Amino acid sequence: MQVTETLNEGLKRGYAIKVTAAELDAKVNEKLAEAQPEVEMKGFRKGKVPMALLKKQFGQKVMGEAMQESIDGAMNDHFTSSGDRPAMQPEVKMTNENWKEGDDIEVSMSYEALPDIPDVDFSAIELERMTVKADDAAIDEALGSLAETAQNFENRKKGSKAKDGDQIVMDFLGKVDGEAFDGGAAEDYPLVLGSNSFIPGFEEQLVGVKAGEEKAVTVTFPENYQAENLAGKEAVFECTVKEVKKPVPAEIDDELAKKFGAEDLAALKGQIAERLEAEYAGAARAIMKRSLLDALDDIVDFDLPPSLVSAEAGQIAHQLWHEENPDVQGHDHPEITPTEEHTKLAERRVRLGLLLADIGQKAKVEVTDAEMSQAIMNQARQYPGQERQFFEFVQQNQQMQQQMRAPIFEDKVVDHVFAGAKVTEKEVSKDDLQKAVEALEEE
């Protein structure tokens, strides 16, 4: 077996691989010998079929497997001895297209090698971590929101008109073309005006009604309405308003706290403070992570595999095009050519991706089974009632597992770098933190 270098420019590599006919024949004989003990053929006991007969009967079938295994073996030996790591799947072509049995196998292999990644002195990286304390105003605001969610409704004075935010209790009957339809009727139905829980335009027409009033509400079902027989059709709902109620926020006291699982109001305030500060810390971490990535991008430089940059630039361009053209589904659109800006962003992403992967490998960072299970459970909650199916889907889908593992791995590597960097804390206001987050989102 011979491997001859044909290209070595930057990260581009090319090799000519030759597997001799004798080596291939030996591989075929080896595979036939492995199979011989299990082969049954008329006139012979199991495992006693002569090799010559086996070769005549199964040689052609085994030949293809032997060729593939020989080429794969040559490639694996090359990568082991050279230390090269291909950036993408190597391109392998058979160069003697008129090959026949008894000829040597000649193939060409080309790929882009992953670059050598320089070590980074984490202690030379200076970062700032914003810290925010949950003040009384923020806690009171959160308490007010909780009180609103726990609000009650009480009857307005007789003759009062319903306002946005009020709850009305009504009977209604919906008709399309004069005919009632399934699901279009209810009695004593409570509806909060402005909640947008009904068809667009329905609730607005009930603002101003009084208890005891009857009102016909005319609306048009959306074109994408789930019930196809109603989609896009005009309907008239005959509504009888029985009660008009105003919202009464819950009192902010120990009773409210108990509704939310706290022992008393002081305990609830403590829980809110912890939650707020956890949210602030998460936002501050995102800001510091961006600062870290910017710093790494500035201090580290190495050659990038063109194929990875090209693929990433294409993906960026494709994603941004769809964000600007949300009505276009799938790939039925003109060819999208990445711009210089897309390529520049792709270079940053590829550089940082390779660097973080290298740092993680050297630091032996691993994603544990427990961390993966937690991530799957968190995402499964987005599919109520289908959690088990989602869990099984992920277990059977390696690509999905990798998509979920990648951000966990990245965050663990980032935390590893944080631990070695010079990090100073700076106490700021909630507004300053919010401005920093908004600036981050605008980039």
Curated annotation (Swiss-Prot):
Which top EC class is given?
A: isomerase
Q: What is its EC number?
A: 5.2.1.8
Where can this protein be found? Cytoplasm
Query: In terms of domain of life, where is this protein from?
Result: Bacteria
Describe the reaction catalysed, as an equation.
[protein]-peptidylproline (omega=180) = [protein]-peptidylproline (omega=0)
| Any Pfam family the entry gives | Trigger_N
Family membership noted in the UniProt record? Belongs to the FKBP-type PPIase family. Tig subfamily.
Where in the numbering of this chain does the PPIase FKBP-type domain appear?
A: 165-250
Q: Which UniProt keywords apply?
A: Cell cycle, Cell division, Chaperone, Cytoplasm, Isomerase, Rotamase
Query: Domain notes, please?
Result: Consists of 3 domains; the N-terminus binds the ribosome, the middle domain has PPIase activity, while the C-terminus has intrinsic chaperone activity on its own.
Protein known as: Trigger factor
Task: Give me any GO biological process, just one.
Answer: cell division
| Molecular-function GO terms, alphabetical | peptidyl-prolyl cis-trans isomerase activity
- Coarse class of the primary localization is cytoplasm
